[in-house]
């Protein structure tokens, strides 16, 4: 577990420090949350610790391959391109992150060049246990959702992370049949 977290941190430090493109992978499971408080209590009983709450503004741009978004929050901004592969409610994502020093200018440029597909604003409470993060998301105009995310070290088989996430979902009392496999903005389309 420590090895996975160290690998993830190393990739993020390279991205933050040098502005280079960093390819990463994760396994995700997203689900509606009728009772975020109960899920948070169960997660904390499993050893998850709250690391903070963020206000995030995501602008999705029109692209022909995958999804491209500019994520802005108080401590920084990132351009994120990702491609998802769905399997039984779990999503394997291949993604690239580039830190952005001038998000307003980039958002204006990308909006003019590509067009805006959607905007999503959310308040995200982040809980973490080893290499697995639990997001409790209050999404404007969409509701409350949870998302489990496990970052994969290079070369690791995603099957082990899917197994871990499935066990956590069961402990949180989230049925696999409730998993959703779309971005928040796609829920109303």
Predicted regions and their residues:
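Short acidic, Gly/Pro-enriched loop/turn segments at secondary-structure junctions
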Residues: 37-39, 155-159
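Conserved, surface-exposed functional patches that form binding/active-site neighborhoods
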Residues: 116-154
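Mixed-charge, glycine-accented linear interaction segment located at domain edges/termini
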Residues: 157-180
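Residues forming well-ordered secondary-structure scaffolds
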Residues: 105, 122, 143, 160-167
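A short, polar/proline- and glycine-enriched secondary-structure boundary/capping micro-motif
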Residues: 89-94, 146-147, 157-159
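Short, Lys/Arg-enriched N-terminal segments with co-localized hydrophobic residues
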Residues: 4, 11-23
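N-terminal strand-loop-strand beta-hairpin
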Residues: 23-131, 172-189
